[in-house]
């Protein structure tokens, strides 16, 4: 786990961030982590949660940009400006 905390959260994929977040939740629920370490990994968990939410918002925006015809069939996509 210690090596994971060195990785910048903003560089993680959704899958990697959610995997690490699940690991943190399990460790905290186990109750065997010392208090100071619990606080540290909780903070990391909060950052991971925000990253996952951000990536989900971006994915939702991309899906929302899919254009459809009158019958509801996808006809293409509109450009999306994600920064």
From Swiss-Prot:
InterPro entries documented for this protein: Exonuc_VII_S, Exonuc_VII_ssu_sf
What's in the GO CC field?
Answer: cytosol; exodeoxyribonuclease VII complex
Reactions that this protein is recorded to catalyse = Exonucleolytic cleavage in either 5'- to 3'- or 3'- to 5'-direction to yield nucleoside 5'-phosphates
Q: Which GO terms describe its molecular function?
A: exodeoxyribonuclease VII activity
Q: Set out the biological process GO terms recorded for this chain's protein.
A: DNA catabolic process
Listed A to Z, the keywords are:
Cytoplasm, Exonuclease, Hydrolase, Nuclease
What coarse category fits the chief subcellular location reported for this protein? cytoplasm
Q: Where in the cell is it found?
A: Cytoplasm
Key word Nuclease present: yes
Domain of life of the source: Bacteria
- Using the chain's own numbering, where are the disulfide bonds? none
Query: What EC number is given for this enzyme?
Result: 3.1.11.6
Subunit structure and binding partners = Heterooligomer composed of large and small subunits.
Family that this chain belongs to: Belongs to the XseB family.
What is the recorded function of this protein according to its Swiss-Prot or TrEMBL entry? Bidirectionally degrades single-stranded DNA into large acid-insoluble oligonucleotides, which are then degraded further into small acid-soluble oligonucleotides.
Protein name (record): Exodeoxyribonuclease 7 small subunit
């Amino acid at each position: 786990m210690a090596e994971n905390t060195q990785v910048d959260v903003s560089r993680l994929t959704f899958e990697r961030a959610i995997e690490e977040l699940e690991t943190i939740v399990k460790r905290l629920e186990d109750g065997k982590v010392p208090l100071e370490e619990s606080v540290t990994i909780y903070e990391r968990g909060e950052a991971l949660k925000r990253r996952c939410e951000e990536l989900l918002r971006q994915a939702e925006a991309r899906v929302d940009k899919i254009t459809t015809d009158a019958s509801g069939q996808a006809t293409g996509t509109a450009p999306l400006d994600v920064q």
